[in-house]
Amino acid sequence: MAIANKNIIFVAGLGGIGLDTSKGIVKAGPKNLVILDRIENPAAIAELKAINPKVTVTFYPYDVTVPLAETKKLLTTIFAKLKTVDLLINGAGILNDHQIELTIAINFTGLVNTTTAIMDFWDKRKGGPGGAIANICSVTGFNAIYQVPVYSASKAAVVSFTSSLAKLAPITGVIAYSINPGITKTTLVHKFNSWLDVEPRVAELLDEHPTQTTTQCSQNFVKAIEANQNGAIWKLDLGRLDAVNWTKHWDSGI
């Protein structure tokens, strides 16, 4: 997908990887970048607008844990203004295994609800034009960081959900792919806790692991968007962008 002249919604587009990716998107010249985030960051919004004044950057407050009806109401407002939306990026996430229910609510349920809501506008069975979804998951969705099993499981759930969305594309007209960053230098990694405090030094230990910068990760994120490959499972690790070949161990046969 050429980003130029497209309308893009980015959920949590002001965080570490999210903000740098938003910068990369704006440089590529979309028509509109709509950022939905829990906390407004006027300085970041101003920076995005300054990068490319031709791009309309808009912010709406959004908490992914709100009821589905509220998400649909917000999207109704956005679609009424833009008429069409080409890409939804689901990027909300927390890493806090002390907060089990909140982790699942933000990392998985909120993403599913946002996706479900936009289907009202995109699903070709309802006369919609289709669209594309990029879900930010994690390499922990492939192989868990076992000291943070709740976070890892929530990301594995999103990888699975996204793969199902991709297979449903012939029915819905909506393609999907997953973005799976490796360990990246963000506040998410530098300060968090393990489940039941099984490893108090987990953040410190991960900090010793080979990492990448948010700039490296975001550059590859933009490349994945431009590739627009339905069903792709992208690994963004150590400054590289690689497609993961998923091993099938079972098939429902339907």
From Swiss-Prot:
Q: What is the top EC class of this enzyme, as a single word?
A: oxidoreductase
Its GO biological process annotations read: alcohol metabolic process
Tell me the residue numbers annotated for binding NAD(+): 10-33
Task: Cite the binding residues for substrate.
Answer: 138
Name the residues annotated as catalytic in the UniProt entry.
Answer: 151
**Its EC number(s):** 1.1.1.1
Q: What Gene3D superfamilies would the database entry show? A: NAD(P)-binding Rossmann-like Domain
Q: How does it assemble?
A: Homodimer.
Q: What is the similarity comment for this entry?
A: Belongs to the short-chain dehydrogenases/reductases (SDR) family.
Q: What protein name applies here?
A: Alcohol dehydrogenase
Gene giving rise to this polypeptide? Adh
